[in-house]
Amino acid sequence: MLKAKLAQLCESILQAAQLPDNLALFDARDEYLELFAVLSAMANFPGGGILLFGVSDAADGAPAQLCGVSDAARLTQIIDWQCAEMSPPIQPLYTQTTVDGKRVLAAQIPEIDKARKPCYHLAVGRPHGAFKRVGRMNRPMSEAEIHSYDAYNSRTRDELRPCEQARWADINPDGVETYMRRLESANRLRAGIDREQLLQMEGLMVDGKPTLASILLFSYDPQSFYPQYSIMAAVYEDGKARECRRLNGTLDTLCEQALQFIRRQLPAAVRYPMDAVREALLNALIHRDYSKYAEDLSVYLWISESHIEICSPGMCYGAPDMNTLPRGLRSLRNPKLMEILETLGALPQEHSGMQYMEDTMAAAGLPRPEIRLADDWCHVFFHLPPSDAWPETAVQDEAMAEIGRFLRRQDGAQLLFNLCRVLPAGKAQQVADAD
């Protein structure tokens, strides 16, 4: 960092009411500074962070105060010693300058490579020495967060682990046969392969036991083995829960039940682009954390007057920050689940997560969905306009799609054909394409 840039940073800090999350201030007059937590948090933070010494932190809403550094050489020795106690060791970049006659010292902490995360204090070990930056606080990482890094680095596939308490008789053979026929039609099966070997190759069986993927997609009752691998749905009015339900079933069934719950609870649901909500639900169910550390956690669906919120356990997998999400530039957690659902036709291959949701909402003239990551959870918000503020295109387009869905459920093939003949071409296509 250039000295002039550091001086500008100090001046902006002294005037700012709120400081960025990647900045930590220290009164260097303290005889001993324990920096292990903030060093770990900054090294794990996207883009790293800056430790600024000689500026006291704001208190009770008051601006930060310039206090200066008396012995910069001794301070750098203290910082270097603590950086060497981290794993992997941290190599800070120092910059000194004078502001209003007082010396300040900045230590830039680089973000470590994702393959080496999490950075932690060696003396206490990873379970207690790995920290993350939450706002301007340093918080210990949970076991699930640490496992997420390990799973990414070692390419651990939690969806392929065997379910020890289950038997293959607990799997619905009809669903598996449908999947096998789809594979055969795609020329992915070779003649002469043993049945059990084939199931193992496709990630459905390990040593005679069904895998988690088999349980989630083909079991008669997945929640009998993993009760919390469900959706907890609730409707709120004036901040109070009006209705709460637990939704059970396989992943595709969970998604459809959740969509029905939304349509039933929201008077305006027929006018909302439900394909975007379906994409968010599928992402939450497929790419949530299915590790042993998250077996007690469900996916949550909350509906209020102002928004629909879908909350799933697990942070971004393989994504350094939120900026890589919209274009789908991230690794995938549980890729076998996605592959099977795509093969079965339950997950359109052309959809690309966040970008698809944004495009769908924009086409309907509605606010883009919002994603927030907090405390190892991923929250997706769909903001609902007031009932008198819905764009006309959203009303018409979703109404046409809903008509198509209704006719398909009623097996009204002939009626659907006749309706499409009299509708304008664009509207007829929306009815015919509704899934």
Language-model regions, residue ranges each:
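Polybasic/polar functional segments that serve as interface/processing modules
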Residues: M1-L105, D113-A115, D275
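Generic, well-ordered alpha-helical scaffold segments in large soluble proteins
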Residues: S12, Q257, F261-Q265, A284, ...
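Phosphate-interacting basic helix/loop segments used at nucleotide- and nucleic-acid interfaces
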Residues: F26-P46, D194-M201, E279-R288, T360-A364
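Intrinsically disordered, low-complexity regulatory tails
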Residues: P89-W168, Y293-L297, P348-H351, Q355, ...
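Active-site helix-to-loop segments that bind/position phosphate- or nucleotide-bearing substrates
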Residues: A130-E295, Y300-I308, G314-R330, L344, ...
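A short acidic, leucine-rich amphipathic alpha-helix
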Residues: L216, L419-C420, A428-D433
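Glycine-rich/acidic phosphate-handling loop/turn and adjacent ATP-lid/helix
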Residues: S306-G345, D388-F406
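Short amphipathic alpha-helical interface segments
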Residues: E398-G426
